[in-house]
Amino acid sequence: MNYSTIQTFDDTKLVKTICTQKSADKNDGVWKYGEDGALQNYEELGRLFGVSTSDIVHVKQTHTAEVRIVTKKDGGEEILRPESVSGYDGMITNEKRLLLCTLQADCVPLFFLDPFQQVIGMIHSGWKGTANQIGVNAVRLMKEEFGCRPSDILTAMGPCICGDCYEVGEELLEPFGVFYSEEERKCFFHKREKEGKYLLDLPEAITISLLREGVKKENITKPFSCTLHDGIFASYRKEKDPVARMLTGIMLI
């Protein structure tokens, strides 16, 4: 299994992270519950992190802005069995040796860590989740349930499609108008010469919302790779593969 890590997080010695890369073996990108080869991949992932598949959890992901708290009893969801509740795209926990995972193929994986309260989060943020502030919802849940201070929270964005590659239609302007001002939208929507087309910078939109919520600029790590033009990580826009995904994960150690 080829992978990268979020170095700023792993350097804390509090967590281990992972962002799986593409490989010649197409089965390496199979992670969804019930798909052929998925369980074997999770078993290999577990060996890498020193845990069993019953200590790994991820949500089904339906492009919501909802985040849930997970515990050891949720381990194995969407791996050994379907998830017990639906409608969530992110997870928060303070339990050690519970590996939180999300799947992406251009969307933004959001990693959270409060090194003081030792709380982590793993979030899938596509354009819908970003427009509806899923990152902010994660910060608020960490604050409300675990006493985390936004100024203490470290945030990192894993590989995703970058603002120079993500072309969208003008119909996305309206959804982003609910939580973002017109001036803010100008920072991450850039009009193209083609009629009705824009370049959308999801990492910048996420950064703006997190700064508003009290996360410090120096505690936000931007993506180190574009899934579309770097060719290292799964990209639906590039490959049109309905199965292949990048798995991203974080675990308190």
Regions found by a protein language model. Give the residues of each.
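Active-site microenvironment for binding and transforming phosphate-containing groups
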Residues: 1-253
